[in-house]
Amino acid sequence: MVLRLLTADDADVFWQLRLEALRNDPASFADSAEEHLKTTVETARERLRKNDPASNFVVGVFEQGQMIGTAGFFRRPNNKERHKGHIWGVYVRPQSRGKGVASALMKEIVRRARELHGLEQITLVASANLPAQRLYKALGFESYGLEPHSLKIGNEYVDDVLMVLWL
């Protein structure tokens, strides 16, 4: 398993994996597959081109040269919120789950975030995905709130669990 920062050269596979994530786990993401299909690989390339290890990056997990998971991190740009970072878009392919991939991915994001001067907390949103919530708690994240009906998919609502890791 290889973990590394994604670059603009990874845009094609990142865009495809994001689409897979949105299709496989729609309740875990605010974006929909339909919305994602309105974007282009070039949009993903531009996002990855703007990666900055000090404030905004995406980490990919690779096994035998294939990307099997991703997670992103961003830090608030304004002075009053620079003490906060946020993890987004955590996804591991179904066939790679239960093998420690998500744990390794999250630990890498947290490791990189801990190196950032002045960062005091990392937040994330956990959906109804109980295995993900258990992983986040095992890594030291704690719940600080619940956003009821955060997402609406068709006629069903999804509540989000708000979590924080104090650094």
Where is each model-derived feature located?
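Conserved catalytic-core motifs of GNAT/GCN5-like acyltransferases
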Residues: 123-125, 137, 142-158
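Conserved N-terminal glycine/acidic-rich loop preference
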Residues: 86-88, 105, 131-143, 148
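Glycine-rich acetyl-CoA-binding "A-motif" of GNAT/NAT acetyltransferases
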Residues: 66-69, 131, 157
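Residues forming the Rossmann-fold NAD(P)(H) cofactor-binding site
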Residues: 99, 103, 107
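Extreme N-terminal starter segment of soluble prokaryotic enzymes
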Residues: 1-4
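Acetyl-CoA-dependent GNAT
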Residues: 8-9, 15-16, 20-89, 93-94, ...
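Active-site acidic-Proline motif in GNAT/NAT acetyltransferases
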Residues: 93-95, 99, 127-128
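Conserved GNAT acetyl-CoA-binding A-motif
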Residues: 113-126
